Amino acid sequence: MVSIRVICYLLVFSVLQVHAKVSNANFNSQAPQMKNSEGLGASNGTQIAKKHAEDVIENRKTLKHVNVKVEANEKNGLEIESKEMVKKRKNKKRLTKTESLTADYSNPGHHPPRHN
């Protein structure tokens, strides 16, 4: 009984190894075909990894371009607002809106400003 079980396990193990070798061989032969179709309907892990690698490279190029633009603006003398300056400007804008909303509109000729 034990020997039959061992033989079955060995048989299953050998079948799985043969299947892995065959599927790996088929995978390598199909890779150029998928490359020509530009990955339409592809579910290969390598193609997904390549796509992610391309995205990372593109993002790095974009970040590099943004950094170059910031450095160019600094060289041209354009002032780049710091977070504190932006915060102050937005706070000032918010306060002026609050003042206009709480203003006394009892005068019939006075119309409230439009806030778009």
Swiss-Prot record:
Annotated positions of the Sulfotyrosine modification: 105
Induction: Not regulated by auxin. Accumulates in both root epidermis and cortex after phosphate ion (Pi)-deprivation.
Domain of life according to the entry: Eukaryota
Deleted gene: phenotype: No visible phenotype, due to the redundancy with other RGF genes. Hypersensitivity to low phosphate ion (Pi) with respect to circumferential cortex and epidermis cell quantities. Triple mutant rgf1-rgf2-rgf3 shows a decreased meristematic cell number resulting in a short root phenotype.
Keywords carried by this UniProt record: Differentiation, Glycoprotein, Growth factor, Hydroxylation, Secreted, Signal, Sulfation
UniProt note on tissues of expression: Expressed in root tips, only in the quiescent center and the columella stem cells.
GO molecular function: growth factor activity
Propeptide segment residues: 21-103
GO biological process: cell differentiation; cellular response to phosphate starvation; maintenance of root meristem identity; positive regulation of cell population proliferation; positive regulation of gene expression; post-transcriptional regulation of gene expression; regulation of asymmetric cell division; regulation of cell division
PTM summary: The tyrosine sulfation is critical for the function of the peptide.
Family: Belongs to the RGF family.
Miscellaneous note of the record: Diffuses into the meristematic region.
Identification of the protein by name: Protein GOLVEN 11
Gene name linked to the record: GLV11
